Amino acid sequence: MRCCLKAFRDSVTRSVKIYGLYISIYIIHSQILRNSCHAPEYGKNGILVMGDVAVTPVPDPNQLAQIAVCTAQTAKAVAGIENPKVAMLSFSTKGSAKHEVVDKVVEATKIAKEMAPTLDLDGEMQADAALVPEVGASKAPGSPVAGEANVLIVPSLEVGNISYKLVQRLGHADAIGPILQGIARPVNDLSRGCSIEDVYRKIGRAHV
């Protein structure tokens, strides 16, 4: 099922009514693949996976942890990232700032590590610490993810949606998504602002 003629919320609501949810996943989330040809040094040859950018406005720690683990699985299955390195993003790196929203990311990181103990996942960390090796080494020494992240987990939908659209438009990145997870059948959605190229890329990913 593919949707792009109405608001994303309507597409998700109808998809859930028609197909239902996987029993093991109590929340739907989505992520976007960004093939950034202008910045191949980031992610895996310029490919980054981000979640959640379209569904859950303010995830709690448990929801954020599940988003992280499932997004890593999608990075491996769909984006060809054999070794996902998941960064739990915040405006703080390893306790550099104190706030309740930072605490949420810290708690989500702990839960995600318990859910997937073999997954390379770390946080909380700022985006530059996650992506730039020199910054990561300075701000989060010893982290298995800092400076090498290819999966970015944002703390809220507001952050994710704004971030990916800025990167897409200002950074000239190819946005492929959102890729929905948690629905019992494959469902894909496209922004009403998408281009013909976006449609072609999404069709290709839908058949992976």
Spans of model-derived segments:
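Anion-binding alpha/beta catalytic cores of soluble intermediary-metabolism enzymes, centered on
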Residues: 1-146, 150-207
